[in-house]
């Protein structure tokens, strides 16, 4: 399983531009699919990818229809979400929603994060999500809610 995950992430990394100022391969085509430039930036952002070990909190969500999955891990220090990271396999929208969720949660006090309107926080960051990609938002919301369950 670990080797499978490494292969998935290395393939994903090959599809991204890493040089500052360069656009994502196929960016024009992605915009034509209804993805906002902000969503594409979150898809391309590696700053919160990965898994925290050890993690104080962890949640997982999977979409059995399309096979997308998401794992959130978090470190809690002084009742605050000090770090939030994600591992995901899925479409462009699933990766972008996961990255936006991790950014929205990181640094917030636990109680504020637990009460946060996750849907609004994600949509505020990615600006626009095509209707056909609603499953990606639901995946992130499910993992986000589970992070706060006992």
PLM regions and their residue ranges:
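C-terminal binding/interaction regions
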Residues: 4-11, 21, 26-50, 59, ...
